[in-house]
Amino acid sequence: MTVEHNHLTNYQLPPSILQYLPIAGSKVVDATQHGQSHYGRTTRLTIQLPSGSFANYFLKTLEGELGMVTCRGEYESLKSIYSVCAHTPAPVGWGRYTEDNIDYSFLLVEFMAIQKQPAYAKNLAACLAELHLKSQSPTGKFGFHVPTCHTRNVQAVDFWTDSWCELFSSHLSRIISHAKAGFAWPEFDNLGKLILSKVVPALLLPLQTDGRSIKPCLVHGDCWDGNTATGEDGRPLFFDVASFYAHNEYDLGNWRASRHALSDSAYTDAYKALVPVSEPESSKT
């Protein structure tokens, strides 16, 4: 199907995407490049329904096997979050198609116009706390049912375990391996081994020993300035999610980086006012 467009010349909507249009007889009347992606194409689609009214969707298209893992993982992440709280665009579907002998994958979601980025501190904290407190792991364990991706890195979280230390160690080990592939630096190798063998167990094992426990919470997975915003209706929004069931404080990790607006103490203070710090608090800085 050739899109009747104003902006993207000769844009073709693959037949595999057509099945997700809301009502039979709907047609795409406009396709506009929207936002920025370092790895694929992002498009706003305007759909005309048989009634004559219009609806907007956001389409992300990526190449190759990594593109498939990314689109599927983000769709499953959005679906999981949306079932708990409607602070994400509604997930519509994902799939695959081939064009000019290139394999593509796509993610189709509700289009939501955004305003301020990041969202206001109290609003974002309330939104994130709602997700963490209301979500329930389907197995009662940490992990996720499919791989999810942080940028172009496939996260090693697609298994289930009772131990947060085990899951985080798997996750961090994969990240360290990705980093090692980019440069040769023996000191980095040694530091990575020490962090995994000494630091991670020292910080995380006490969360689940001596009678203490933590709940596996559904997390955003990449909660930084660029992946949260205020919508047109004033509500905070999440997007570009890379979810799994984790310790809730995982989502606050990005907030420690001074380059992020979320490093402002107002964000952490607002969250801690709603969700207390996990014990033993004395082991944290």
Feature locations, PLM:
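Juxta-kinase regulatory segment immediately upstream of eukaryotic protein kinase catalytic domains
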Residues: 1-31
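Helical subdomain adjoining the active site within ATP-dependent kinase catalytic cores
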Residues: 185, 189, 277-284
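Active-site Asp-x-Gly
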Residues: 164-169, 173, 177, 213-218, ...
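An alpha-helical support segment within catalytic cores of ATP-dependent transferases
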Residues: 12-22, 97-100, 136-220, 231-233
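Short acidic/polar mixed-charge low-complexity motifs
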Residues: 25, 51-55, 235
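ATP-binding pocket architecture of kinase catalytic cores
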Residues: 33-166, 170, 178
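Short, surface-exposed alpha-helical segments at coil->helix boundaries
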Residues: 10-14, 75, 265-268
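Membrane-helix interface segments
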Residues: 87, 117-120, 263-264, 281-285
